[in-house]
Swiss-Prot record:
Summary of the function given for this chain in its UniProt record: Catalyzes the formation of 4-diphosphocytidyl-2-C-methyl-D-erythritol from CTP and 2-C-methyl-D-erythritol 4-phosphate (MEP).
A Gene Ontology term for the protein's cellular component: cytosol
Family affiliation: Belongs to the IspD/TarI cytidylyltransferase family. IspD subfamily.
Organism: Leptospira interrogans serogroup Icterohaemorrhagiae serovar Lai (strain 56601)
Highest taxon of source: Bacteria
EC number(s) given by UniProt: 2.7.7.60
UniProt lineage: Bacteria, Pseudomonadati, Spirochaetota, Spirochaetia, Leptospirales
Entry protein name: 2-C-methyl-D-erythritol 4-phosphate cytidylyltransferase
Enzyme superclass (EC): transferase
Keyword vocabulary terms for this entry: Isoprene biosynthesis, Nucleotidyltransferase, Transferase
Site (described: Transition state stabilizer): R22, K29
């Protein structure tokens, strides 16, 4: 691997293409309010307040772009972009990547807009892993017993010491991403790490804070209201 990349740039793709269908809402989930502000704004603020120089690209459905321009304008810098996404998460990620002029040493982070509780020190640790290992993701452990089922019946129990729940951001170094982009896929990957694994590239894990949930359903939004004050506390304690 190359030595430390002192001239690297950091790019952040925030995928904001949710429709709100699983939420049972006509309003896309990224626009639903959490403590008086859209969820998207909470997620955007996590990166704007990070303290690192970075370029942010927001990716969304065409019909949502005017709304994003309206609510996010004051949080975006001159080089930040809002771009139209694709038909699914992977194609939307590719749309965001297509506007980046990244180099081999650069770091690209991909984050779900519906995850508003990521910590700055986690972002630092993730970037360190990406520098050294090429691909990395935030993930969390479980204290629960994990089982596998088939047709509603228990089949086996998994060793929870080796079970992690995938989170975002996920990150990739520019040289590794360039290689991935040369391959064609037979099926649609669910995220950056599954895309990489399709071609034999494993991802390193950085442990995430326990509040880093993805707001997908109404009960998630209810939890997020509770988590918000806890998140502010752990953010200030670090």
């Amino acid at each position: 691997m190359k030595s430390l990349f002192l001239s690297e740039k950091i790019y952040v793709l925030i995928l904001a293409g949710g429709t709100g269908s699983r939420m049972g809402s006509k309003i896309p989930k990224q626009f639903l309010e959490l403590n008086g502000e859209p969820i998207l704004i909470h997620s955007l603020k996590r990166f704007q307040n990070w303290g690192k120089q970075k370029r942010i690209v927001l990716v969304s459905h065409f019909e949502s772009i005017p709304k994003i321009e309206s609510i996010c304008a004051s949080y975006l810098e001159n080089e930040d972009r809002i771009v139209q996404g694709g038909e699914n998460r992977h194609s939307s990620m590719l749309c965001g990547l297509s506007v980046l002029d990244f180099k081999d040493e650069d770091i690209i982070l991909v984050h779900d807009a519906a995850r508003p509780f990521v910590l700055a020190d986690e972002l630092d640790s993730l970037c360190e892993k990406v520098r050294s290992d090429g691909i990395a993701t935030l993930a969390s452990r479980t204290s629960e017993t994990v089982l596998e089922e088939l047709n509603g019946k228990t089949v086996s129990f998994l060793d929870r010491e080796h079970v992690w729940f995938m989170k975002t951001p996920q990150g990739i170094r520019g040289d590794v991403l360039k290689e991935l982009l040369t391959f064609s896929v037979d099926s649609i990957p669910t995220d950056l790490c599954s895309w990489a694994l399709t071609f034999g590239k494993t991802s390193s894990i950085v442990e995430s804070n326990p509040l880093n949930l993805k707001i997908t359903r109404k009960e998630d939004l209810d939890l997020a209201e509770v988590f918000s004050s806890l998140f502010q506390k752990i953010s200030s304690d670090i």
